[in-house]
Swiss-Prot record:
Single GO biological process annotation from the record: translation
Native organism: Metallosphaera sedula (strain ATCC 51363 / DSM 5348 / JCM 9185 / NBRC 15509 / TH2)
PANTHER family named in the record: 40S RIBOSOMAL PROTEIN S8 (PTHR10394)
Summary of subunit composition and partner proteins: Part of the 30S ribosomal subunit.
Family assignment from sequence similarity: Belongs to the eukaryotic ribosomal protein eS8 family.
Keywords for the protein's UniProt record, in alphabetical order: Ribonucleoprotein, Ribosomal protein
Protein name: Small ribosomal subunit protein eS8
CC terms in the record's Gene Ontology section: ribonucleoprotein complex; ribosome
Keyword Ribonucleoprotein in record: yes
GO function term, MF aspect, one: structural constituent of ribosome
Length: 128
């Protein structure tokens, strides 16, 4: 079943509203992409409005981590999800979202990109 993001077809009281038109293609949505820690990076392409393509990162093994103290960036392996400000269950399930704190080979890092929307994990190294 698809995700519908148009206006509700029922009133607060439960009665039906008078509908002057049907559903439109621009009102469809999709299920959220829950990026999980895995042994390799797996991406999938999705067609979006206007015929454009969106790259979704479904499984992640590596992150681009920037060290702000010396300005260098490295591609490092993700070991685990420590904490997630979006949902406390995400850390337990190993789901990476923007704002999550991940443990990498070089230390803890804060995720700054949206993996389900951008197809890549960018992060900032946290000071120890």
């Amino acid at each position: 079943m698809g995700v519908y993001q148009g206006r509700d077809l029922r009133k607060i009281t439960g009665g039906k509203k008078n509908v002057s038109r049907g559903k439109r293609k621009f009102e469809i949505g999709s299920q959220p992409t829950e990026t999980k820690v895995y042994s390799e990076d797996i991406r999938e392409k999705a067609r979006v409005l206007g015929g454009n393509a969106k790259v979704r990162l479904t499984y992640a093994a590596y992150a681009n981590v920037i060290n702000l103290s010396d300005g260098t960036a490295k591609k490092v392996k993700i070991l685990e999800v420590i904490e997630s400000s979006a949902n406390r269950e995400y850390a337990r399930r190993g789901i990476i979202v923007k704002g999550s704190i991940i443990r990498t080979e070089i230390g803890k890092a804060l995720v700054t990109s949206r993996p389900g929307q951008h197809g890549v994990i960018n992060a900032i190294l946290m000071q120890q």
